[in-house]
Amino acid sequence: MKIMLFSLVLVGFLNSAYAHHSFGYHFDVEAEVTIAGTVKEFKFINPHAQVLVDVTGEDGQIETWTCEFRGANGLARTGWREDTFRPGQAIELTGFAARRRDTECYFDHAVMADGTRISQDGPLGGDLYAESASAETSAIAASGDVPNFTGVWGQAPGMGAGMGAGMGRGPTLGGPNRFEWVLSNAGQRALEAYDPIVDDPSIHCKPPSLTRLWGTGNPTQITQEDELFTIHHEWLDVVRNVYLGLSEHPEGIADRVMGHSIGWYEGSTLVIDTVAYEPSVLFQFPGLPTSNQLHTVERLTLSEDGRNFDISWTAEDSAYFTEQLSGNSRPLQRLNTTLQPYNCTPMEVA
């Protein structure tokens, strides 16, 4: 059996690890582990792909390790495929140790029997989902009085995933909750009842909030009609309809995961007003709970050349917040790719 565990200094580590959950809550960034064994199975799934490796101990007993990656859709855009790892292959794998299970890790790189080194963030080939149109021809500037957001958008390749609100790489385990100050007494009680390890909605394939949707590493497709603006986030297959023909929200709307949205144009900006949310969290880590009184306003502002747009937002919650919160997400650019079904597989946590 070959298993090595030691500390390391981390510099600029794995931005993509934050695409779906806060890395530090599940894995130890200061503990690197290396295992050697045989590939048992490669699960090319979302939100996290997994490779299962059988490691034979000194006593001859086989122990199966599970090491996870970012999601299959993101991997496919850097050349990964379902058969990148095949059962029976000899593998030496290096990753970062899980905090709660001794035989789990987060994949960093692997060395195969022929000496090939495979890195999660190193491209293995072309984008499986790339369109034939070039980025130059797909960039469309605003037309007439209505800014043209139609197309596929996402973060620039290599940017990793943001957490919204200028939060960078995401909070660390045991770190301060930078937004706790906004919570009312009721909000504080909701925070005390929230466990980010097991209650994170995305673990259960449910989108937590608009800030997370805009901050993932997966693309978003927008279509525009006269009275409907549709935002299709590849992550978790979320589709949001923004009704442009309404001046106010209808009465008696049932609460829903992503609320009810109306919108209007202000020059090169689309303003999205959303109410009737189900209770959730604005940020999963360490947690910022929201009630069904949450009211958000997003502003999507298209650049002059039509190739990028900025995202800013405000959030009010008369039940859980004492003041309004505001923030922004990383700008998105037009992408030369197509959306794919996400088909989220719920995660097991302990």
Where are the regions that the model predicts?
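Short, compositionally biased strand/turn segments
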Residues: 11, 19, 238-240
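Boundary at the C-terminal end of the N-terminal hydrophobic targeting segment
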Residues: 17-24
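PEST-like low-complexity, intrinsically disordered acidic/proline/serine-rich tracts
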Residues: 24-350
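Bacterial N-terminal signal peptides
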Residues: 4-16
